[in-house]
Amino acid sequence: MSLLIPPKLIVLGDSGVLGWGDPEEGGWCERLRRHWMGLPQGPVLYPLGVRGDGLERVAARLQAEVSCRGELRRQRPQGILLAVGLNDTARVGRSDGRPQLDPEAFLFGLQQLLHQAQQLAPVLVLGLSPVDEAVMPYADVLWYGLEQVRRYEALLEEACLEADVPFLPLLESLLADPAWLQWLSPDGLHLNSEGHRQVFERVKRWPALLRWANLQPLGAPSLSV
């Protein structure tokens, strides 16, 4: 009997991927990993989030993260999910200071990253979560704002459309709920447990991700006979 090997997805990103702010269940990515573990032939998920990472640092570790997680000899993961960009939106020193990575450099770097990642495996990209401007600055030096977050998420979408990469916008979906501020940690930047649950529920039902995973959409009728 041949061994059925489930597909492997690596998720590259920042503290959101790490699950910071969710002591209950370890974040949206960990929730997805556990959810898939409970499914027959569910994909294997590697959450690879590093606190503080922006686009450039994620790009710098792309090759190494992919190359060592094939599990079997000469194998690679079958998918890459990028969840990055929020840290790049922060303005340094004051509310109108320079961004950590200016929009033009962000877009160019993202285009390069998508091209490199597509040479390794199918790629998907996740949008950005909201921030609470009223409690800024973060760590007394970084100013996050909704206008900046909205601008950078639009750049994510632009690059994904150009590269024909599936993209799941998050910002407006989360902001549409009147309770969205209650989904943030006191620092105004990181999602709390409920915020991570909200993102998990959206990612879990993402049609592009379900197609990649060869999983039947939730609520869809069974095709078995």
Could you tell me what each predicted segment is?
Residues 1-51, 56-57, 63-75, 80:
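Serine-esterase "nucleophile elbow" of acetyl-processing enzymes
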Residues 59-225:
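Alpha-helical cap/lid subdomain in secreted, periplasmic
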